[in-house]
Amino acid sequence: MKIVIDGMGGDNAPKSNVEGAVNAIKEYQVDLIITGDKDLLEKEFSNYEFDRNKLEIVHTTEIIENEDKPVKAIRSKKDSSMVVALNLVKEGKADAIISAGNTGALLAGGLFVVGRIKGIDRPCLCSAIPNVKRGMTLIADCGANADCKPKNLVEFAAMSNIYSRKVLGLENPKVALANVGLEEGKGNDLVKRSYEEIKKLDLNFIGNVEAREVINAYTDIIICDGFTGNILLKSAEGVALSVMSLIKETFMASTKSKIGALLIKDDLRKLKSFIDYSEYGGAPLLGLNGGVIKAHGSSDAKAIKNAINQGIKFSKGKVVEDINQFISKYNEENKNNEDE
C-alpha cells in the first residue's frame, strides 16, 4: 500500500507536507510518494531523520495555484504536483492521494483523472465537524454538488455510511437528513423525496435534523446537498472560531481572569483540540475509483499526518470495493424505476 501526497499543494507547502509525511512514516510505517519540485523537497526532507526507504519523490515542474480555474488547470498543467499524484492513483501506483491544494481542481481531477465508480452519479465530499454528543459528525455532501436529485442523496447516505464504518470505526453509524424541521414530511421536494428513499436503505436512519442541532445532535452523519452542506460546515467553523476568540478575550481582560485561565488551562486545551480542524484530517471525496482526500488549505503538519492516516484506513478498509458493491446492487434493484 502506498499513499501519495501533493507536495506543493496548500498554503504552507511544501514544509507542512514534508513534516507531515515524515511524522506519518515514523508513526504508521507507511510507504509514501510525494510529488513536487525535487530539489525543494529534498532540501526540506534533509532537516529530518527518518527511514528514507519509505519515501519516493516524483519530480514535477508545475503547481496548480488557488486562483487557477479548476478544470482548465487540470487539463493544462499535466506536470503539476496534483495531476501527477492523481495519475499515480489512477494507474494503481498509489492507493490514495492527500492534497491541501486548490479544492475545485482536486474535485475536477478526482472526477476526470481518477474517475467515478461505475454506477455512481455524483461523488460526495464529506467533512467532519465537532459534535458535543458524538465526538464528530460527517456532513455529506459539503460542497461538491450544489444541485442534487434524490438519487444523489441516497448515494451520499450509503457512501458516507460505508466510510464511517470502515475508516472511522463506527459499528452502526446514525444517519440523519438536514431539514427545516424534525417531522417527517417537512422540507422542500428534494428533501421529502430523499427521506422516503433513504428510509428504504439498510441504514440506521434516524430521520431529520435541524441546523441548530448540527454540533449537538445524536447523529454521526448528516445528509444534504452540497450547497446546504457547505453553509452548515462554514457556519460551524465560524461559530467555533468566534467562541475561541471570545474565550481568549474574556480570560485576557483582567489579572483575575488570567489567573482563572491558568487554573483551567488543561480544560481550555481540550476545548481547543475539540474544535481544531487538524484533529479531523481531511475530507474524502467518495464515489471515485481510488482514495481522494482533501486536506484543509492551511493544514499544518499534524493535519497532513492525520489525513495520511485517513488514506491508510481508507485503503485497508476497502472503501472503494464496498461502494462498488452497494451501487451495483442498488442500481440492479432499481433499474426499472424512473430516473429521479
From Swiss-Prot:
Residues annotated as signal peptide: none
Entry coiled-coil feature ranges: none
Pathway: Lipid metabolism; phospholipid metabolism
GO cellular component: cytoplasm
Recorded catalytic activity of this chain's protein: a fatty acyl-[ACP] + phosphate = an acyl phosphate + holo-[ACP]
Keywords: Cytoplasm, Lipid biosynthesis, Lipid metabolism, Phospholipid biosynthesis, Phospholipid metabolism, Transferase
GO MF, one example: phosphate:acyl-[acyl carrier protein] acyltransferase activity
UniProt-listed Pfam families: FA_synthesis
Subcellular location, record wording: Cytoplasm
One GO BP: fatty acid biosynthetic process
EC number, as in UniProt: 2.3.1.274
Protein family (similarity comment): Belongs to the PlsX family.
Function: Catalyzes the reversible formation of acyl-phosphate (acyl-PO(4)) from acyl-[acyl-carrier-protein] (acyl-ACP). This enzyme utilizes acyl-ACP as fatty acyl donor, but not acyl-CoA.
HAMAP family to which the protein is assigned, alphabetical: PlsX
Description of how the protein assembles with itself and partners: Homodimer. Probably interacts with PlsY.
Protein name: Phosphate acyltransferase
Species in which this protein is naturally found: Clostridioides difficile (strain 630)
Taxonomic lineage of the native organism: Bacteria, Bacillati, Bacillota, Clostridia, Peptostreptococcales
Gene that encodes the chain: plsX
